[in-house]
């Protein structure tokens, strides 16, 4: 487990069972807090100034990796196994691509993606992007909706920034060729979704993410300063220590097609690798969402926050309720967008009783956490497998125009959504927590920026408002550009730097033998399923201290069993393989979620505890996980490479 889990705000925070009181806090080392009674910061202006100043030198300290102004470098390959770029971007969703297009104006960019470039959470996003574009709407209204949905754990400054800058980010997408739906008056058609008090969802039917991904990816592939490396799995970040400062210099990757390790050395790294939906057995996320970025950042000494807040989307398609059953199980659950309820969809149990008004006066338009818990309660009380979402009372042409993708998918399996209700069930959807970031995407690791689902910016609080995810990714990807380019211009790289870290070794038949590799892969698949079942059973929509401590114990036992098998069969600290590296990241993220959940003794937003069923004002504070100790951690929590303490500016 993480070495330290704590919660903190401007009034008090909790660390290792002790309570400290003050008005602010900052870091004095990698594992302790210091209280400062003289300032009263918000999430962004205070806590992140502490992160930025104490851990990152405010991007102006004369620490070793920062030098006088340097020129952008050309993309250099010292060998096929080492590449040098000004910027490395890990992830090819909306955050990574939008950032890459901007920083490419200043230098060379490597975009590293685990699968095909389009295979990201962005590509699966159906609903849209929320933005204040209607004269009847206002930034204040969008802010209020965001903070109410987030159970008032959101940072107000972050919320204001995102809601204010959102409309301009939409206009930029349109200028880049993204095509969104328009109404009969020629203006953008703005939909409404749960938790929103106004129509403000910009969308492209029910395939908004796919359209945004198309436009951005087309621009990226045509940019001469950007190189896209597909099928490259990010293993671990490359870091060095300068006093108390951790500095990021790039990333090691595994070329999945050639089974070779490729090292990327860069002046700036953006982590935009998405979420960790596959710690659960049913998720709307694609197979690539195994928490790689969050786990890598944690191992690299980045601060992690609010991991207990896992959003379960209330309405994923329940395949067992379809007239024509699937021949093989899906790799990820098919999402039924929030917009169906926003357009008037009604939820019924299998007895055709409408139930949402019983739980919340907002009924089907309540925030996702409320709707998911309500459905979960119905399923448990009635011992049923799914509920029904009915939109068939709306005009057929309107349904098919707004939800063509959903209609087509359901029709494949014998269900006509214009006449029949849709069977739905909650599924893991979005991580509201992640790598703690400031208003410019900065982290406590110098040279490492984050954007998108991998980040915890303070926007979502305890529950994300529908269609705020793509919005956040766009805003923070753009805000990270200026500090990134400034840092790039002040940073020089050693062309010999690649050899300053131990290189990972690929698990091959020559190294371990075919039989051993087959056994390891088989066990890893089995352990992955077991971990997912533990997370769903004990760390799902409704939790308790007993369930969480049970999960903690079972995960530790499962991880020990898996790691023991590996290392008894010739595995070593630096050995890598795709299945094993994904498993280590899933273990790491699962432990972060459980640790955070155990630290929050209240029910707030997505975190509902049966033994702490009420919101407590004194606990309206973020959960913080400090870096773990590499000497006592399991393999999933240790970096593969030895950290170099030497300067990387020898040239």
Swiss-Prot record:
Recorded catalytic activity of this chain's protein: L-aspartate + O2 = iminosuccinate + H2O2
GO terms, biological process: NAD biosynthetic process
Biochemical pathway: Cofactor biosynthesis; NAD(+) biosynthesis; iminoaspartate from L-aspartate (oxidase route): step 1/1
EC number of this enzyme: 1.4.3.16
Outcome of gene disruption: Embryonic lethality when homozygous.
SUPFAM superfamilies: FAD/NAD(P)-binding domain (SSF51905), Succinate dehydrogenase/fumarate reductase flavoprotein C-terminal domain (SSF46977), Succinate dehydrogenase/fumarate reductase flavoprotein, catalytic domain (SSF56425)
UniProt binding sites for FAD: 92-95, 114, 121-128, 292, 453, 469-470
Cofactors: FAD
Signal peptide: none
Protein keywords: Chloroplast, FAD, Flavoprotein, Nucleotide-binding, Oxidoreductase, Plastid, Pyridine nucleotide biosynthesis, Transit peptide
Family: Belongs to the FAD-dependent oxidoreductase 2 family. NadB subfamily.
More details: The viable mutant fin4 (T-DNA insertion in the promoter) is impaired in the RBOHD-dependent pathogen-associated molecular pattern (PAMP)-induced reactive oxygen species (ROS) burst and stomatal closure.
Name of the protein: L-aspartate oxidase, chloroplastic
């Amino acid at each position: 487990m993480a070495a330290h889990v704590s919660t903190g705000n401007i009034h008090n925070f909790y660390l290792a069972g002790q309570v400290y009181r003050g008005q602010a806090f900052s870091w004095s080392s990698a594992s302790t807090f210091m209280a400062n009674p003289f300032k009263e910061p918000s999430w962004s202006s205070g806590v992140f100034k502490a992160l930025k100043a104490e851990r990152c030198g405010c991007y102006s300290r004369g620490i070793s990796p920062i030098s006088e102004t340097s020129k952008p470098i050309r993309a250099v390959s010292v060998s096929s196994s080492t590449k040098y770029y000004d910027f490395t971007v890990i992830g090819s969703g909306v955050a990574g691509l939008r950032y890459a297009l901007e920083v490419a104006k200043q230098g060379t960019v490597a975009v590293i993606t685990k699968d095909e470039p389009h295979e990201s959470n962005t590509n699966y996003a159906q609903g849209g992007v929320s933005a204040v574009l209607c004269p009847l709407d206002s930034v204040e209204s969008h802010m209020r909706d965001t903070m109410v949905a987030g159970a008032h754990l959101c940072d107000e400054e972050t919320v204001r920034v995102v809601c204010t800058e959102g409309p301009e980010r939409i206009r930029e997408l349109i200028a880049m060729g993204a095509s969104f739906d328009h109404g009969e008056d020629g203006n953008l058609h703005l939909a409404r979704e749960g938790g929103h008090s106004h129509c403000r969802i910009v969308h492209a039917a029910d395939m908004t993410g796919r359209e945004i991904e198309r436009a951005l990816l087309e621009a990226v592939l045509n940019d001469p300063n950007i190189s896209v490396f597909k099928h490259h799995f990010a293993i671990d970040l490359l870091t060095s220590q300068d006093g108390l400062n951790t500095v990021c210099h790039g990333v090691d990757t595994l070329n999945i097609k050639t089974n070779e390790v490729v090292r990327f050395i860069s002046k700036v790294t953006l982590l935009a690798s998405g979420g960790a939906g596959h710690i659960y057995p049913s998720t709307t996320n694609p197979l690539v969402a195994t928490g790689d970025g969050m786990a890598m950042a944690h191992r690299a000494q980045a601060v992690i926050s609010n991991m207990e807040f896992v959003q379960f989307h209330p309405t994923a398609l329940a395949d067992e309720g379809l007239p024509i059953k699937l021949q093989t199980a899906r790799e990820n659950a098919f999402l039924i967008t929030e917009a169906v309820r926003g357009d008037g969809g009604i939820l019924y149990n299998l007895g055709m009783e409408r139930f949402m008004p019983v739980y919340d006066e907002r009924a089907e338009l309540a925030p996702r956490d409320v709707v998911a818990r309500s459905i979960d309660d119905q399923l448990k009380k009635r011992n049923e497998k799914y509920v029904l979402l009915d939109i068939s009372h709306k005009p057929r042409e309107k349904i098919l125009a707004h939800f063509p993708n959903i209609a087509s998918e359901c029709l494949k399996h014998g269900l006509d959504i214009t006449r029949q209700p849709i069977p739905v069930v909650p599924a893991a959807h979005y991580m509201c927590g992640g790598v703690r970031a400031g208003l410019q995407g900065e982290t406590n690791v110098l040279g490492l920026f984050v954007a998108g689902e991998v980040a915890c910016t303070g926007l979502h609080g305890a529950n994300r408002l529908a269609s705020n995810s793509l919005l956040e990714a766009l805003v923070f990807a753009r805000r990270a550009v200026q500090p990134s380019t400034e840092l790039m211009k002040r940073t020089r790289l050693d062309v010999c730097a690649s050899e300053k870290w131990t290189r990972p070794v690929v698990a091959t038949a020559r190294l371990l033998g075919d039989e051993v590799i087959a056994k390891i892969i088989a066990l890893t698949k089995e352990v992955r399923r077991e971990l997912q079942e533990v997370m769903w059973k004990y760390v799902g929509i409704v939790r308790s201290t007993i369930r969480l401590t049970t999960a903690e114990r079972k995960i530790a036992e499962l991880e020990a069993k898996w790691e023991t098998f590996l290392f008894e069969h010739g595995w070593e600290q630096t050995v890598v393989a795709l299945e094993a590296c994904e498993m280590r990241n899933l273990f790491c993220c699962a432990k972060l979620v459980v640790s955070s959940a155990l630290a929050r003794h209240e029910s707030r937003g997505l975190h509902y505890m049966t033994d702490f069923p009420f919101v407590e004002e004194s606990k309206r504070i973020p959960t913080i996980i400090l870096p773990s100790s590499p000497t006592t951690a399991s393999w999933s929590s240790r970096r593969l490479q030895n950290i170099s303490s030497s300067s990387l500016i020898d040239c």
